[in-house]
From Swiss-Prot:
Keywords: Ribonucleoprotein, Ribosomal protein. Disulfide bonds: none annotated. SUPFAM superfamilies: Ribosomal protein S2 (SSF52313). One of its GO terms (biological process) is translation. GO terms for molecular function: structural constituent of ribosome. It comes from the Bacteria. PANTHER family: 30S RIBOSOMAL PROTEIN S2 PROKARYOTIC AND ORGANELLAR, SMALL RIBOSOMAL SUBUNIT PROTEIN US2M. This is Small ribosomal subunit protein uS2. NCBIfam families: rpsB_bact (TIGR01011). Pfam families: Ribosomal_S2. Belongs to the universal ribosomal protein uS2 family.
Length: 247
């Protein structure tokens, strides 16, 4: 099992939190101190929590379960899409649509429409339409693909969520909580860890940090799937209760 180490996290700037005036007291136990009015995250605490989350994801993937990667803010979207695609996992990189989990039946209908438009764009149907109608369908296709392209092959609800910036993706976390879907989340010093089953205290803004989180998670999914291919039986633990978060 491959583990993240302290050197990796320091190089990526995982330890740099937000300005001290924006801190969330519920993250106090993960803060080492402050430097130039910036909170410094205690990586001695982050390291085992990060590796525990990776172990959970690897075990889930070994059971052929689906992990949905969520990161819709500007600094995260591109990396989320690339790493999710690398490990063959579903993702949301543009905008979380309300009801994406709790109203998946309706979302499924939109995915069906997306697939229909994809077929029409490839089989020459668009070319037979009026210019205006073809343009409207092309715009519909682009809009649906931007919103749902990352989950069109998910097939059903995911078995876990991995979230970059839990405050930014609070709606996604709330929906997962309602459905009992475990949440793994990067939680910065200005955010609340509530509703997150596997907390990774760390910088949720720096590109290199996001690359480390996403790359490590994608690697964990790939390792888990390779375990299946190799016939390895792996026991999947239940996520610790979100209610256990102190504060």
């Amino acid at each position: 099992m491959s583990q993240v180490n302290m050197r990796d996290m320091l190089k990526a700037g995982v330890h740099f939190g937000h300005q001290t005036r924006y801190w969330n007291p519920k993250m106090g136990k993960y803060i080492f101190g402050a430097r130039n009015k910036i909170h410094i995250i205690n990586l001695e605490k982050t390291l085992p929590m990060f590796n525990e989350a990776l172990t959970f994801v690897e075990r889930l993937a070994s059971g052929k379960n689906k992990i949905l990667f969520v990161g819709t803010k500007r600094s995260a979207g591109k990396i989320v899409a690339e790493e999710a695609a690398r490990c063959g996992s579903p993702y949301v990189d543009h905008r979380w649509l309300g009801g994406m989990l709790t109203n998946f039946k309706t979302i499924r209908q939109s995915i069906k429409r997306l697939r229909e438009l994809e077929v029409q764009s490839e089989d020459g149907t668009f070319a037979k339409l009026t210019k205006k109608e073809a343009l409207m369908r092309t715009r519909d296709l682009e809009k649906l693909d931007r919103s749902l392209g990352g989950i069109k092959d998910m097939g059903g609800l995911p078995d876990a969520l991995f979230v970059i910036d839990v405050d930014h993706e609070r709606i996604a976390i709330t929906e997962a909580n309602k459905l009992g879907i475990p949440v793994i989340g990067v939680v910065d010093t200005n955010s609340s860890p509530e509703g997150v089953d596997y907390i990774i205290p760390g910088n949720d803004d720096a590109i290199r940090a996001i690359q480390l989180y996403m790359g490590s998670m994608a690697d964990a999914v790939i390792r888990g799937r390779n375990n299946v291919a190799g016939g390895t039986d792996v026991f999947v633990e239940e996520a610790p209760a979100a209610a256990a978060v102190e504060g």
